[in-house]
Amino acid sequence: MSLSRISLALALVLGSGVTLADDPDQAIRQTLKSLDASLPIEAIAESPMSGIYQVQLEGGRQLYTSADGQFLIQGYLFQVKDGKAVNLTEIEESRAVAKQINAIPAKEMVVFAPKAPKTHITVFTDTDCGYCQKLHSEVPELNRLGVEVRYVAFPRQGLNSPAAKELVSVWCAKDQQEAMNRAKTRQSVAEATCDNPVAKQYQLGQMIGVNGTPAIVLANGKMIPGYQPAPQLAKIALESND
């Protein structure tokens, strides 16, 4: 089911047999599962707002519910601290994304690293994407500024597209960096096949909300959709370590 910020929210079932006197976790799960048995609930916990629970879905997305699961809130939860509105939802979603992205084994990515990296970015990329090619041309500058670039595959036209086939060839090349360089400069890449993570990475991208390339994930899990010039991107990436 495509949640797209949860259109199911406004159709909650009012007849759940679980009451507030029961375990809220059980009540919330029962009500949400009655809407969609395949809803990917990963965790339920009390939110900072009294009486409201936060539901973490697969991919890091957050929902908010009453303790009995009968009321569902869609959108962002803010907390005012020192006169500023802090987006708690964005923080939680970024934290969940960071946990998944930073757990990808290095051997499953194509990595361009400086000698002494200060931070890293993970880039969902496609080989025939113009802005992906532009970003790749600035990887040496990003490395010079201390940013390690980790590529994961995201064929925009799907797993049966020519770009997906080329991404597989890049991941299966003996020299992945050289193959990536060739692909990003519109040169031919020798066709190759092997056991590869392209499909898995594509599915991960869909799960966390990637819908175009390049999609850049900072070390803290915050996502930047689209190309950013190297100096600006490096500044944002380095600040994400704070």
Model region roles, listed by residue range:
Residues G15-T19:
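N-terminal signal peptide c-region/cleavage motif recognized by signal peptidases
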Residues P24-V111:
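Extracytoplasmic c-type cytochrome modules immediately beyond a signal peptide or single-pass transmembrane anchor
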